[in-house]
A protein has these predicted regions:
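Glycine- and acidic-rich phosphate- and metal-coordinating loops
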Residues: 96-119
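Short Gly/aromatic-enriched secondary-structure transition segments
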Residues: 38-45, 224-225
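C-terminal nucleotide
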Residues: 1-26, 30, 51-90, 100, ...
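Alpha/beta catalytic cores of group-transfer enzymes, especially the acyltransferase/condensing modules
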Residues: 145-193, 331-334
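A short glycine/serine-rich beta->alpha loop
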Residues: 17, 35-40, 77-85, 116-124, ...
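DPxDG-like acidic metal-binding loop motif
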Residues: 45-47, 124-144, 343-346
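Phosphate-handling active-site elements
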Residues: 101-109, 138-154, 347-361, 365-366
Length: 510
């Protein structure tokens, strides 16, 4: 059963939380390892990420707690320099330090409880996610009025200067600037960006998580950065180029003769060709040309594996298995590599079969339980309503939907509201405001609350069952439905069938 983070917060910090925030993770569709080489990238923010529950403190200290690092307990500090023993807390500390060094002051401290729906080892940018989340918390609570781009830049400074992680700006921008149902076409050299509609037609992106993280990813990443810089320094002595991604493809043969070894040339070869693949993907997505996009994805993996040497045996195996599955037209590793995850482009008709087959075959081949899930392009970091506020509105909206759909009468409003509260283990809730949202969105709020509070298990099966339980509040007993059906059928069998269809549709049964 899922724990109640709301209850945990009170037990850990001794008070109720006042604010709730969310920041998405990100996945890069294409453009790997060229952000720090001044290239273009095509990331999306995804519908998984990190949440923060926050309350104000009476002193100026900041206290951090992460459900992912429960054993570390509360990390309370007013010293925001890097400290190895502070672990995950160095990410929010670095953001705070970056803000302080820019002249921003914080008149009071905060208690911040982090919990995540993404694995740190998945390669979905959990570090940048917690940075942007922290910056969003500070921006909102202290009313700093910083733009999304400014937040991204401050987070990148925190990561590069205070955490000494030399990377491009992609991760922070992909998260902070995210727009729902759009990909971000980002120029890492000019710092320009453009939104393009994320519409894959009959296809979806499935994340294929190897669950085999590398213990040396940071050192290997830094080595690639150094190799690229060394190659660029040599090339600059002979060609007027500013970054590796600006090298024309026709120069590659001449450049191969300039570089002292084949390894450096292969690094340059990947960077130059990956930039070309991003530009082709950009045009393909705008034209809804999925086949061309798929070709770029596949070629990207080959280059990352053979030229940039950042793949792994598990990544190669998961990509190989994915490409052999019916409905999958492309797959590649994504992220820094050396472990982490891949992405697959899969036809919607084969999603269930794909995930089931991949889970079995990957385990059979590696002995590792992988994880396979679809992702969609979501919006950026934001403040969320407190659980009870959004819940009361959802209940009010659901009851109003039932009245409008003629499932219940106006006189049944209080009775049905109380029945729903009983299923949620609540005796009372403040009266909410109904909103004309789609039924699935209303139900999602109620069902996710039940999972969050440990009322139901956080599984698709348990959520589906609870969906049916809630909607049954509005449905007459089977005996009453049968009587009504036979009564109508005496006049018209067609109308009797319409009655069954309409009540099934309105009650979310079909």
């Amino acid at each position: 059963m899922m724990k109640s983070y709301e209850i945990d917060f009170k037990e850990i910090f001794g008070s109720n939380y006042e604010y709730k925030f969310f920041s998405p993770g990100r996945i890069n569709l294409i453009g790997e390892h060229i952000d720090y080489n001044g290239g273009h990238v095509l990331p999306i923010a995804i519908n998984l990420g990190i949440y923060a529950l926050v309350s104000k403190r009476r002193d100026k200290s900041f206290a951090f707690f992460s459900d992912n690092y429960f054993e570390m307990g509360i990390i309370k500090t007013n010293n925001f320099d890097y400290a190895k023993n502070d672990g995950f807390a160095n990410y929010p500390k670095a953001v705070i330090r970056s803000m302080l060094d820019s002249g921003i002051s914080f008149p009071f401290g905060l208690n911040i409880y982090f919990y995540s729906t993404i694995s740190e080892q998945a390669g979905l940018s959990s570090g940048a996610c917690i940075e942007v989340l922290t910056a969003t918390v500070l921006n909102e609570i202290y009313k700093l009025n910083l733009t999304s781009f400014e937040l991204a830049m401050r987070c990148h400074k925190a990561q590069s200067e205070y955490l000494q992680l030399n990377s491009g700006i992609m991760d922070q921008c992909a998260i902070s600037l995210a727009r729902e149902n759009n990909a971000l076409f980002l120029d890492n050299y000019m710092l320009n960006y453009e939104y393009i509609p994320y519409d894959l037609g009959d296809y979806s992106i499935v994340v294929c998580q190897t669950n085999k993280p590398s213990q040396k990813v940071n050192s290997k990443y830094k080595q690639r950065v150094r190799e690229c810089q060394r190659a660029l320094d040599i090339i600059k002595n002979n060609f007027n180029v500013l970054t590796l991604t600006k090298i024309p493809k026709e120069y590659l043969e001449m450049i191969e003769n300039l570089l002292p070894d084949n390894k450096l040339y292969r690094r340059v070869l990947h960077v130059v060709t990956e930039e070309e693949r991003v530009l082709k993907s950009y045009e393909a997505l705008k034209e809804h040309d999925i086949d061309t996009f798929a070709l770029q994805i596949n070629a990207s993996h080959e280059s990352l594996r053979d030229n940039y040497d950042v793949s792994s045996s598990e990544l190669n195996k998961i990509v190989e298995l994915a490409r052999n599955e019916q409905g999958c037209i492309a797959a590649r590793m994504t992220g820094a590599g050396f472990g982490g995850c891949a992405l697959a482009l899969v036809h919607n008709d084969f999603l269930v079969e794909f995930k089931e087959n991949m889970a079995k075959k990957y385990f059979d081949e590696t002995g590792i339980h992988g994880a396979f899930f679809e992702v969609s392009a979501c919006g950026g970091p934001r403040r969320l309503p407190k659980d009870t506020e959004s819940l009361s509105d959802a209940i009010a909206s659901l009851v109003q939907y039932a009245i409008d759909s003629h499932l219940i009468e106006e006189e049944d409003r209080i009775y049905t509201t109380n029945r729903i509260l009983a299923y949620l283990n609540l005796d009372y809730i403040d009266e909410g405001t109904s909103h004309p949202e789609p039924l699935y969105m209303i139900l999602d709020t109620i069902i996710n609350y039940a999972a969050n509070m440990g009322i139901i298990e956080n599984t698709p099966e348990a959520k589906d069952a609870f969906d049916a339980t809630i909607m049954n509040v509005f449905v007459p007993r089977p005996s009453a439905i049968i009587r009504e059906f036979y009564s109508i059928s005496e006049k018209s069998s067609t109308k009797a069938l319409e009655y069954l269809y309409n009540i099934s549709l309105s009650s979310n049964y079909i």
